[in-house]
Amino acid sequence: MESWELTDQWGGSKIKLNDRQLYDTNLTLQKRYAYLPWSQGAGKTVSGTVQGMYRLAHGQTDYVFVVSSAISIETTWAPFLAKYRIPHKVIRDRKDLRKVYPGDFVLITLGRVKNYKKYIQKVVRLASRKLFLIYDEAKNSSALEASDDVGKLTKATLACFGALRYKLLMSGTSINNNVVESYPQLLLLYNGSANMLCKARQLYSVNEETGEYEAYENDRYMQEYPPYIEGLNYFRHSHLPEKLTVFGVVQRRQDILNAGELREIISYTMVTRTFQEVTGKNLEHRRELRAKMNPAEEDLYQVALKEFYRLEKEYFKSTNMSARKMAQARIIAQIKIMLRICTCATVFQDYKGPEITGRMEAIFDEIRRIPTNKRVTIGVRQNNIVRAYAKAAQKAFPDRPVFTITGSDYQPHQRRELIYGRFEDFDNAILVCIQQSLSESISIDSVDYCFIAELHWNDSKMSQFYYRFIRYISTREKYIYYVNFPESIETNLIYLLVSKERMLRFLKGQDISFEELFAEMGFSLPHHRGAVFRGYDEEGRPELYWGQQQIAA
């Protein structure tokens, strides 16, 4: 494989694995199934293609099934295989499954796997399971609940491809929120084999009165996990019996239980590399940009905080379960309102302040310090916030072109045309966009400065966005800014981000302390001691209060 290379159809572009990619690709080829959680932009598509071509050439498989999201299939895999003249077939109708030939890469979206499950299973039977599965963005299979759309897709994927002889899962981030999300992926990989036994001697549950963990004996010790939801519950009670929450994560960070047993399962198949390890380039610089609310923002935030306080008390007035659920939904909505105020107070009718908020002013001040011949991106999560930031940017920078991309304005190919055409025609352009609108699809190496103006619930979602600008071919330094108000509920969200990232690092074989990771992600711990807590008043009713966060050892 050292001499392997691909030349595009015009003969002008050649690609070849570097030493690290070659080493890891060889490791995964030595196993029938493997997980390749390389960082975004590190060349997973190239490595997967190489492995598919190798197994086809050596008679190990008749077909290579590439399963991924629709945007990944249409804007990454299909153009890549076409560019390098590799035989492939995109499945858009069930009749297309009759038109595949031995040696083909068969590209199919997750939705069509669910819709054409019976027909795919027939192809698998006819090929005597002699197929190779490449599951790109495997984190899309992170649930098993029958009522969940993700759960339905996951079950269909397991039914079609669980018994294949060769499987390769790939994802820049294997989980979004907690380690329990890795179970469906491991189940697909190992297919209930002896390599995935329930090795935890003790299981754990949470005492509802004390909030502490209670251990009990595992009745399936050294046995296979039960199918589907029952197996998921055993996995959950083995390693993380409770979810991370906006409040709980600050008061008690959830460490992974039975960590040694989980690390053993992971070590069988995962080959983890960061972008720097694969490329040899240290281009990524993450920083925190702390902003200060203007008086109008502070007034609006206090209104939301007091309203939230009132809703918390109402939550326990009735013992009726439906009422409790309704109140809980109101609380969640109130948290989102507080976070929305932090991001862009101008979208609220009760806001009576200037058009350029304190957060916007902090971003614009930083942009003024950046050389004017550099392109800049500002990422948010809501269409109306895109429009508000774009309007403010046009006012603050009248001599610079401002482009916008929302989740509804453009189809994926239209977004690519906007980026590679109009946006890159200007050296000083500013792009304001929905973070999700660029994930898994577009590479924009021309952008060196990215502002995360609206924090997500996990860093893996945000990294899917900012790694659009940090690519394998990149040579310039890249700067990522996390914008936040330290004295707000965003401090809780930052703790949540770091805790989830710590779990992801564990799955990648890295044991890092909370404090070290806090600094590595660019946040300043002394500026985030104050956070919103849920407590109880003298009458035992829940209330919110501000406190100084103490970091546990």
Q: Where is each model-derived feature located?
A:
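Conserved Helicase C-terminal RecA-like lobe
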Residues: 3, 9-10, 15, 29-30, ...
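Conserved helicase ATPase motor motifs in RecA-like P-loop NTPase domains
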Residues: 40-41, 164-179
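Conserved Walker A/P-loop ATP-binding site and its immediately adjacent core
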Residues: 45-47, 60-83, 179, 381-384
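Conserved helix-turn-beta segment of the N-terminal RecA-like "Helicase ATP-binding" lobe
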Residues: 71-94, 189-192, 396
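Conserved helix/coil segment N-terminal to the catalytic DExD/H
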Residues: 97-104, 111-129
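Inter-lobe coupling linker of SF2 helicases/translocases
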Residues: 107-112, 126-127, 150-165, 195-347
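Conserved RecA-like P-loop NTPase helicase motor core
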Residues: 403-492, 500
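A conserved SF2-helicase RecA2
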Residues: 460-466, 470-552
